[in-house]
Amino acid sequence: MSSHILQLPTGKQDFKTIVKDNYYFVDKTKYIKSVFQDDSSQVLLITRPRRFGKTLTMNMFESFLSLNYDDPNDLSEHIELFKDKEIYKEKEFCEKFMGKYPVISITFKDVKALNFKDAYEDLGELICDLSDKFLFLKDSPKLTFNDKKAFAKLNDLDYLQNKRHLNTVKNSLKKFISFLYKHFGQKVILLIDEYDVPLAKASQFNYY
C-alpha cells in the first residue's frame, strides 16, 4: 500500500495556490467565522511573530469573502476551494458571507525605501496597481462623473508619484471603499498586511 506525501508550502502565502496544487494545509478556515460573525469588532488587528501565517490567513479571508467581480452570482471557485474545509460545514454562515463582499487587500511589504522620495513613489505604484483590480469602476453606472475622474487619478502612476498630489494618495483607500460601496451596494472589507514596514524603514533611515 502506498501513501501520498503532501508537499510543505514553504514560502507560499497564496491560499488558492496551496489548495489547488494540493500542498499540506492545516485547516484553520473556521477562524473566518470567529472573526466575521462571532466577533463584533469593526476593526481587528492581528499581531503574531513573523512566519506565523498572518499573510496566508488574510489571503484565505480574501479568497472566501471576495465577490467574483466578473459575475457576482458565480460561487464556483469559492466552492471548489472550500468544499472540503471545515468552514464549508457552516452552511448558514457560508450562504451569508462566502463570495458576498468587495474586498480590498493591500500589503505594504515592498514600501521599504531608504528615503522619503523613493518610499512615496513606491506607495504611488502600490495604489496604482491596486486600482488595476477595479477597472470595472471606470464604466460603473453607479459612480458619478466626478467619482470616475477621481478613480482615473488613482489609476495614473505619474499623477500619484507627484508629491503635489499627496492628499490623493493619503485618501486613496477611503476613495476605493466609497467607489466599491456605491457600485455593489455592499459593505467593503479592507485587509492590510505588513502595515508596519514603511514605518519601520522610515524610522530606521530617519525620514519618519
Where are the model-predicted features located?
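Alpha-helical scaffold elements adjacent to nucleotide-binding pockets in ATP/GTP-utilizing enzyme cores
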Residues: 34, 52, 56-64, 118-130, ...
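P-loop NTPase motor core
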Residues: 11, 16, 27, 66-136
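Walker B catalytic acidic pair
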Residues: 193-197
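Conserved helicase/translocase P-loop NTPase motor core
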Residues: 165-187
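Walker A/P-loop-proximal flanking segment of P-loop NTPase domains
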Residues: 2-90
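Conserved P-loop NTPase mechanochemical-coupling segment
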Residues: 10-19, 111-170, 198-207
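A generic secondary-structure signal for well-formed alpha-helical elements
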Residues: 39, 61-72, 127-135, 184, ...
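Loop/turn-to-beta-strand initiation segments
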Residues: 42, 102, 185-189
